[in-house]
Amino acid sequence: MEEKRNGLRVILFPLPLQGCINPMLQLANILHVRGFSITVIHTRFNAPKASSHPLFTFLQIPDGLSETEIQDGVMSLLAQINLNAESPFRDCLRKVLLESKESERVTCLIDDCGWLFTQSVSESLKLPRLVLCTFKATFFNAYPSLPLIRTKGYLPVSESEAEDSVPEFPPLQKRDLSKVFGEFGEKLDPFLHAVVETTIRSSGLIYMSCEELEKDSLTLSNEIFKVPVFAIGPFHSYFSASSSSLFTQDETCILWLDDQEDKSVIYVSLGSVVNITETEFLEIACGLSNSKQPFLWVVRPGSVLGAKWIEPLSEGLVSSLEEKGKIVKWAPQQEVLAHRATGGFLTHNGWNSTLESICEGVPMICLPGGWDQMLNSRFVSDIWKIGIHLEGRIEKKEIEKAVRVLMEESEGNKIRERMKVLKDEVEKSVKQGGSSFQSIETLANHILLL
């Protein structure tokens, strides 16, 4: 079957967010290794680095986003770019199909579940579409029921019910719901409905997950969306760390890690989207300083509200922090997590980061920002028991305590042991004969027959 894939081209269209671009390009690599030619259509905003992927064809389309719109929240940005990009995308895809040679047939489009117009466009051009979901399958399965949960009367949550489970959405707790929905409210409902409806009309659903992490949820996904489901993750496990980052990575942090003792460093990163207040920033700084544990802290420029970078830190606090740690603007995360010196990860629990931490066997301290991160963190702390949940308390004493428990105490050792077991299970999934390895072959043959 593999020889037949030569001469077939797959079109990929990532959503222009760091957490969506990386998985799409990793998927492109997976398919390219299996004989498919790759074309990536992308927006001007957050354009991927074509030079890092010389074997792929990159086609840029205008997105019409103003600087003001780029600074808006993720939901506003998604709404605007879905409006602006439809016509340019249609024109670009039509041109690719018209110019495709008989010797290299375009077989399908694979795009992110957050694009709402691509199913209609692909149908109008008679091109099969597959959906890539960069969330945990358990979370995506809840898309049809999230509007019902929002109106169920769980919010606002009383103190006595805060730790109660959400019956329709275990292991989520009622206190998590306000951060799942954020300020979106009912604005979210039409978006969720459109995602579900276009996924049901697609030719397949791809997850960067595996049966070892959520077998029952993957089975349920097939029942909910009524399309073939391919769990082929974790994507990054198939290749060495790639340079798909939209941010400039500070490689000096690897040299700094080289000088640290094994499993002694707590790595701190809240991802590419989460923002915190100046007060929260200072609490994290003091908690890390007081823990006396070596740390590598990623502070993304603009991530502290009202500040360009680390200006809120006093000179005295900077000196105290520099005694034990290193602060950078962005880090090569996969390399950091794989480094022998890294012993823990204080994370926002985006699905990419959670998977990367599991694959490298690094236990977590959970500080989710919102949306799917709330569910991911509950699985880490309550189901898999491979991390400690801060329960939203960004307080120096809580952060110091969590770091000490994870890095120094017996409970941290138990967490580390459970993490090793899960790491080994997930590792098997991507090896020959593993569930994800087999699912990739099934996906490749599915694309061949479209």
From Swiss-Prot:
One of its GO terms (biological process) is abscisic acid-activated signaling pathway involved in stomatal movement. Inhibited by olomoucine and 3-isobutyl-1-methylxanthine. SUPFAM superfamilies: UDP-Glycosyltransferase/glycogen phosphorylase. The keyword Glycosyltransferase applies. Coiled coil: none annotated. Gene3D superfamilies: Glycogen Phosphorylase B. Keywords: Glycosyltransferase, Transferase. Optimum pH is 7.0. Involved in the N-glucosylation of cytokinins. Catalyzes the formation of both the 7-N and the 9-N-glucosides. Belongs to the UDP-glycosyltransferase family. This is UDP-glycosyltransferase 76C2. The lineage of its organism: Eukaryota, Viridiplantae, Streptophyta, Embryophyta, Tracheophyta. The gene is UGT76C2.
